[in-house]
């Protein structure tokens, strides 16, 4: 039995006692030997950055509330935790702190685990793992070698950001204004060998599978559909001539709009295209441009926003219908890694081509017009409005200036051109996807070594399974210039497993999305000899996955893809890894700053600022506590280090207790919306916790409650009991179906307020109060488990795991009302209310409504034409 000071709510004492009980009883360890229905709930695993932030707290509290609720409703619940421990931040910290990334990572895990435990999450810690340990990553190494043998993993050249000073590849976010974030060197585009997984082989299945994910937000599914980007079109061949008329390798371009083919006035190719490199050999000016374009962006987003640049190659492409020769241009908005690296340019009907043609004086031809223009302006084609109707797919279009295809609509033109090109061997129908194969190579040290050996005789050879894992050395000196494993000949040099000759290991490591793509399955069998064992099919797919919508595309796409790889390897039976997805909103907070001498801003933490607010809680002024001088108000933004507006969860737990922090994080906003951190709101939750504590102790201090006798209750007692059971019904629905935790808390608060006004000290009055207080403690248990654990004992129910106590169920008989309050309207306007017996007849209700004093006044001089009764709600008297 825990000991708690009677009338004083001491969060630290209460929470320590509850956590000791949970640890001693191994309360949240689960196995598969249960007759209960399973429920697998988890949040996206954290990166061990060193400390939790409020985004973590919100994320993990959401999943913990659902997990505890599901336990109380009779489910066998798995809620695990682990660490996404590889990645770039550890390398950056190693440089800054002059320590090995492994040492930094493991120290952070220890600290963050303690923080998570202080928040009282119902986690099965026996399943914990870190993805940087060999006993975890050996399984993805084994899977990769199997994918190599199946042809699903392959190596080819790809363009990356290269820092020539640090001699390393940079992620896009490490390139700032075209320079390396650390060295300041001008970043180059460099083509280097990279390993890829053939996610494109699964593109259609990934697309079709979205239709089965009814429990995923539509916004996430839409983003994935757009990212997969299925399109149907024609692949068309353009023969190519050099300036001397010699024939070169043909260009193949994919288009979804073959109806615009006669509008092609040039062909655009990527700077890395073989034809561009061929032309540059005899064109120094073009060679210089290609060298300049090496320093540009490599992502679609960057290419979309940068200024259009290009140059004629001197080559020409032969139009496949007209036979006309059109110039071939290098254009910086064409990606070599997308499609064929070549685009048929139709400046009359494509914005990027239009902008490029305008800049370089290239011809622009209209080949599509509206079949039925709505006004005189639409009858005339010009650059100011053609995009509006061309992109409006609901309008009927027809071809013009297109020879024998004039007058055809899109469908007719598509079929005619497809038939022609397929007959002549100049093209074919094709389904294309925007989705690209997943590049999994990273030129970094702190990651899972790619299990490949390079032999001059045998080529790239997968490491034999009996030689796995290829272990990453952890005790290294890390400077940030190059990779320690690349410069370590002892680690790098080995023998070829096929021929026994001298060979070298791959020194690239896996993209860290690899580790986070299968960890959900590993939790089901964390000590299994293989990647997973039969227990995976008991738990998978996970029932609820909680995480930010910013992961909608990359992580969640790779996550689904890797699960299908595991399915095809017969490791799991399910097609999808997760049935339901909840994407929680950001945690935002006020920002404050002062202008810096360098023209920037010095951001000041809200904890260091004294804030003035108006009656609506809006910030009206702020001064720095240290000097009493004003600071600028920056508005509310996502908590971040860059804006210095983060709040330390540990300090909040120390000040208010874990339950209060959990309560505020669930009350301040619905899960999908942004949560504005406001310490005044936390204070409000702390006051509620103290009131609840006092309510329970006051009740218990007045003596033991007798058994409830429903038949003996007075009207007032019935009303309180009805309120209790209405609250039970609402909170259960809010937890289980709606995940609307803020309204669940509000309902319990309303019940608490009603109970505070209920001063009936009779035996049955106290029995009703006992039932209400027990219900409140259980209803709040998923959110405030420590206080609920203590208050359940105070109410005389003994120390037990509340997750094993059934969640309250509303008593239907308690919800029946003896009397109803109806609104009285005259011609639709509210004029009063009446109380009627629940079994009152229509005639009785009509008479009471017309006799209601205020309604009677408005009826003077009028004739009642009819009376409309909405049962249980409204009486509307129509009079004139």
Swiss-Prot record:
Substrates-to-products reaction catalysed: tRNA(Leu) + L-leucine + ATP = L-leucyl-tRNA(Leu) + AMP + diphosphate
ATP-binding is among the record's keywords: yes
Disulfide bonds: none
GO cellular component: cytosol
Lineage start: Bacteria, Pseudomonadati, Pseudomonadota, Gammaproteobacteria, Lysobacterales
Family membership noted in the UniProt record: Belongs to the class-I aminoacyl-tRNA synthetase family.
Protein name: Leucine--tRNA ligase
Species whose genome carries this gene: Xanthomonas axonopodis pv. citri (strain 306)
Main enzyme class: ligase
